[in-house]
């Protein structure tokens, strides 16, 4: 079979930079799915993307589908011929539909009888006759929330489309994509190189675009080039560029021919907290800030332009003029905000509604303050600092800086708290109260910070559930799922001795009569338990392990985590599968017992050697297990219990549990109940698969 390389390019207006990668990846996934469905073999496929183009390159694509034989089954032989052996009308109609006579049909014998069959040879379709429709279907399935129309065209896409190119080797594939006829014309850079040129071969795409059109179409190459050049530029001025991958991705999606330049700003702006300056540079201008070896912000920034200029100094000057007013704003806001303490802003929180039924932000910080102090008392943190940090926790939202640069909330609160003379614990808690802000973010570690972060999240969870606005489906306007994961992570990762029931009860009490949902506390607990399952699954923990622990309903997250780790370790032991099966068997036996389960073991009624051995082993282990359970050393406890395997196996091999003698039966049930209870101190091992 012959092969060729395929190139598909769609030339567009500037595509949304934050969607560029997703569009390209989806286009590739959709097209390769089409090729696979059509049984078209290929070696590999990659995507390219730049601000004004999406492209796919498929290597060693088969030039045609393979010929194949399709079995077309007809009527059963018993109904295909009449009593005289002549073909029935049904048989003749089937044969005619397949272009053969009944006599030319083959026979197929199955366990259900004999059938007429025609093995039709179907010739494969040439690839060039399939690609246009496949590419169109791939484009139709792109994740475009708001498609647009342009001109008089009824076609819709994320941006207007100007060119479409489909080449199979050197051959132009005829057809249309989004109403644009396929042609060899490829557009170059807007301001450099050839505005457009003819592409002779699919293999020339990257090199011709780069050399003739001044476009680097390979997204990853552009990204790597920007990163390398930015790092070199920063090193030249004795610093290190702050290159977050998300910003790097966005910048790479904005330029076709990246040129990295270095600019500066007045040193006087460094008196402003660096986070505000960085927010301005990165968020508004898409610049890379530069820091020295000590982590101090330098009065420089690195930016990427989309053109090779004969006068780069002019471009640098232009960017410096653009950023200067934003930095001046930050300086003005900071100096203005410093004239008022955070405490003096407390009354203004009364003017901001948190939620209609839950009151103002002032009401919320009062609740956070009380709950944070309650948590601090249980964890050994400074309760006075926790109460103070909770009270001030939202005051920075009323500052000019945070109103203008919203992502600096918490961070500016920390700086203002330090300027106000608050304790360092209070200042740090102002920033860390929002942690973890996103998946993979760190959690607060300082005691006061943990107390305030937990109080804030729990107040929101209990309050929103309390007014009957729990998340439904994908909708989660109050980000309760993130808050719940945050609560669990803070407690688990800091090994805090906190009980969810106690925390929820306290939070509910602080809401007073605001809550209309009488089941709020139970619903919040269930919601948190469900987040446990999702969180551990994301960490690769087996569902059966999670369910085994959930069955015991431990409400202390740190304790829950210890059980998860212990059961995960237990499952790696050789004895685990046999003991899990035995526990399942014990559970089934005990479930059939009517009334209360027997609990007292009478040694004189242990008549069989196997039950005597099991009882002796349990008696030997129990004094060793008790302190392990008390200290939550579940892993060591399960390791000891794994030593029961042989005794348990022998018991079920030799002993009839449901004996006719009632006393013997109850004694054996008590023995099994005791055995099961030892495991249930940790988890329901019977649920392990």
Swiss-Prot record:
One matching Pfam family: DALR_1
GO-annotated cellular components: cytosol
GO BP, sorted A to Z: arginyl-tRNA aminoacylation; glycyl-tRNA aminoacylation
Compartment annotation: Cytoplasm
Cystines in this chain: none
Predominant localisation class: cytoplasm
EC number: 6.1.1.14
Alphabetized GO MF terms: arginine-tRNA ligase activity; ATP binding; glycine-tRNA ligase activity
Annotated catalysed reactions: tRNA(Gly) + glycine + ATP = glycyl-tRNA(Gly) + AMP + diphosphate
Keywords noted in UniProt: Aminoacyl-tRNA synthetase, ATP-binding, Cytoplasm, Ligase, Nucleotide-binding, Protein biosynthesis
Enzyme class of the recorded protein, top EC level: ligase
Subunit structure: Tetramer of two alpha and two beta subunits.
Family stated for the protein in its record: Belongs to the class-II aminoacyl-tRNA synthetase family.
Protein name (record): Glycine--tRNA ligase beta subunit
Native source organism of the sequence: Shewanella baltica (strain OS155 / ATCC BAA-1091)
């Amino acid at each position: 079979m012959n092969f060729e390389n395929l190139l598909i390019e769609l030339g567009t207006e500037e595509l949304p930079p934050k969607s560029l990668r997703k569009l390209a990846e989806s286009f590739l996934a959709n097209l390769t799915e089409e090729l696979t469905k059509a049984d078209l073999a290929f070696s590999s496929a990659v995507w390219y993307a730049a601000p004004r183009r999406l492209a796919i390159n498929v290597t060693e694509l088969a030039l045609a589908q393979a010929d194949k034989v399709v079995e077309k089954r007809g009527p059963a032989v018993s109904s295909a011929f009449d009593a005289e052996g002549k073909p029935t009308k049904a048989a003749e109609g089937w044969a005619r539909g397949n272009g053969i006579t009944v006599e030319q049909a083959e026979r197929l014998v199955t366990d259900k009888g004999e059938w007429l069959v025609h093995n039709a040879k179907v010739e494969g379709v040439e690839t060039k006759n399939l690609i246009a429709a496949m590419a169109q279907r791939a484009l139709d399935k792109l994740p475009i929330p708001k498609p647009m129309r342009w001109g008089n065209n009824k076609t819709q896409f994320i941006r207007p489309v100007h060119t479409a190119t489909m080449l199979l080797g050197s051959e132009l594939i005829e057809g249309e994509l989004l109403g644009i006829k396929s042609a060899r014309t490829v557009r170059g850079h807007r301001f450099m190189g050839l505005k457009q040129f003819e592409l002779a071969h699919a293999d020339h795409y990257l090199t011709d675009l780069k050399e003739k059109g001044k476009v680097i179409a390979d997204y990853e190459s552009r990204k790597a080039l920007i990163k390398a050049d930015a790092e070199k530029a920063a090193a030249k001025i004795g610093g290190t560029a702050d290159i977050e991958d998300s910003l790097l991705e966005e910048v790479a999606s904005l330029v076709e021919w990246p040129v990295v330049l270095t600019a500066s700003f007045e040193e006087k702006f460094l008196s402003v907290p660096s986070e505000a300056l960085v927010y301005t540079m990165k968020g508004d201008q898409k610049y890379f800030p530069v820091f020295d070896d000590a982590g101090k912000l330098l009065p420089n920034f690195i930016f990427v332009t989309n053109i090779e200029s004969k006068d780069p100094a002019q471009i640098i000057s232009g960017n410096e003029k653009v950023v200067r007013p934003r930095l001046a704003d930050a300086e003005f806001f900071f100096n203005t905000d410093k004239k008022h303490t955070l405490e003096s802003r407390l009354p203004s929180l009364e003017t901001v509604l948190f939620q209609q039924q839950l009151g103002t932000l002032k009401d919320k910080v009062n609740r956070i303050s009380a709950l944070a102090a309650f948590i601090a008392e249980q964890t050994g943190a400074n309760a006075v600092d926790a109460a103070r940090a909770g009270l001030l926790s939202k005051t920075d939202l009323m500052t000019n800086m945070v109103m203008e640069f919203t992502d600096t909330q918490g961070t500016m609160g920390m700086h203002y708290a330090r300027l106000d003379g608050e304790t360092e614990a209070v200042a740090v808690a102002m920033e860390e109260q929002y942690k973890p802000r996103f998946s993979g973010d760190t959690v607060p570690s300082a005691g006061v910070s943990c107390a305030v972060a937990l109080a804030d999240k729990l107040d929101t969870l209990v309050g929103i559930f309390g007014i009957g606005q729990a998340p439904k489906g994908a909708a989660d306007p109050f980000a309760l799922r993130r808050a719940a994961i945050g609560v669990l992570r803070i407690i688990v990762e800091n090994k805090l001795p906190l009980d969810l029931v106690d925390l929820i009860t306290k939070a509910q009490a602080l809401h007073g009569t605001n809550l209309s949902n009488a089941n709020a506390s139970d619903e919040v607990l269930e919601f948190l338990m469900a987040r446990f399952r999702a969180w551990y699954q994301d960490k690769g923990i087996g569902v059966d392990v999670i369910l085994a622990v959930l069955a015991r309903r431990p409400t202390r997250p740190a304790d829950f985590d210890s059980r998860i780790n212990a059961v995960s370790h237990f499952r790696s032991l050789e004895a685990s599968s046999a003991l899990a099966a035995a526990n399942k068997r014990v559970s089934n036996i005990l479930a059939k017992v009517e009334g209360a389960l027997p609990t007292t073991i009478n040694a004189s009624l242990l008549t069989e050697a196997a039950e005597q051995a099991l009882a002796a082993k349990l008696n030997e282990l129990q004094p060793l297990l008790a302190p392990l359970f008390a200290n939550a050393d579940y892993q060591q406890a399960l390791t000891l219990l794994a030593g029961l395997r042989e005794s348990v196996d022998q018991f079920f091999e030799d002993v009839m549990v449901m004996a006719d003698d009632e006393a013997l039966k109850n004694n054996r049930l008590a023995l099994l109940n005791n055995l099961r209870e030892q495991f249930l101190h940790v988890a329901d091992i019977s649920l392990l698969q």
